[in-house]
Design a protein with these regions (language model features):
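Basic, Lys/Arg-enriched alpha-helical interface segments
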Residues: 1-126, 133-287
Length: 287
């Protein structure tokens, strides 16, 4: 019985089915963290969203090309009708490590989309930046494709603050004592420097920042919590073996010499599946 390894194998299988090759030397924890990071990157199109435009983007729209305007409207329609927006996403969406372009997503939940589909032979260098909260997607701005440290764009945060200040974790009553240059922000956040100067105060990452590995802190914390719960359930199943065997006999099933469990997921719950008797024990809801 090794539920953590079972979960890693479930995650590995799903990633492989999505065309993502998972290195065999990754340990169980790494596989699960990367799975959550990549899953977050793909965006959830299973629900319908409303779309809100910033004042700045509304003003800029007439200056964009007809193809760019069409792409933005198409993305809006896809969000409203539960159609995938993956065709407008970066070709790196299936990469197992994206050092810079995931930076805004992991820290502030800010996505970016190309204004051409990945099948069109992209030549347009502009990106649409947006930030979801609940069932509303906030279209922030269309800006040139950043490179390197330019992925940290203070003007994006200015637009967010001027239109939807509640989307930022902004503290006007706190001011960092050390200024972090834009080109060092990514590395500073990995070293747990969380407060960045902003409008006389500071902003904190909306999604708890990144770990020293560069992985999303929320993903790392979620995997740690799940692993702890799975370990606790392994101990609980061993502790309740006599009780479980009584239930097996009541069901008039053949009692195996050794109870062997495999972790499965059914209807949003983690399930302990006993491979000899085929009994299923509900553990806890998948968070």
């Amino acid at each position: 019985m090794n539920f953590k390894h079972d979960l890693a194998e479930i995650s590995r299988k799903e990633l492989n089915q999505a065309g993502i090759v998972v290195p065999r030397d990754w340990d169980d924890h790494t596989v699960c963290v990367k799975y959550l990071d990549i899953h977050h990157r793909f965006f959830d199109s299973s629900v319908s969203y409303m779309v809100a435009y910033s004042k700045e983007l509304k003003k800029k729209l007439p200056t964009l090309t007809s193809k760019e305007q069409y792409a933005i409207k198409d993305v809006e329609e896809r969000l409203k009708t539960q159609k995938s927006i993956v065709p407008y996403m970066s070709k790196q969406i299936r990469a197992i490590s994206v050092s810079k372009s995931d930076f805004l997503l992991k820290n502030w939940n800010i996505y970016h989309l190309h204004l051409e589909k990945d099948t069109d032979g992209r030549s347009n260098g502009n990106l649409l930046f947006f930030q979801p909260q609940g069932r509303i997607v906030h279209f922030i701005d269309v800006r040139p494709h950043p490179k390197g440290s330019a992925w940290f764009d203070r003007e994006l945060f200015d637009i967010i603050y001027d239109n939807w200040p509640f989307l930022l974790n902004y503290r006007p009553d706190m001011k960092p004592t050390v200024t972090v240059p834009d080109e060092n922000v990514h590395d500073a956040l990995k070293k747990m420097v969380l407060a960045l100067p902003f409008r006389g105060g500071c902003i904190f990452p909306t999604r708890l920042g990144v770990a020293t590995s560069g992985d999303s802190s929320m993903a790392v914390m979620k995997v740690n919590r799940i692993f702890n719960n799975l370990t606790a359930w392994e101990l609980e199943l061993n502790k309740k073996e006599k009780e479980i065997r009584r239930e097996i006999r009541k069901l008039k099933l053949r009692e195996p010499d050794l109870l062997e469990y495999r972790l499965e997921i059914e209807s949003g719950f983690f399930i302990a599946y006993e491979i000899h008797t085929h009994i299923k024990i509900e553990l806890f809801r998948v968070p």
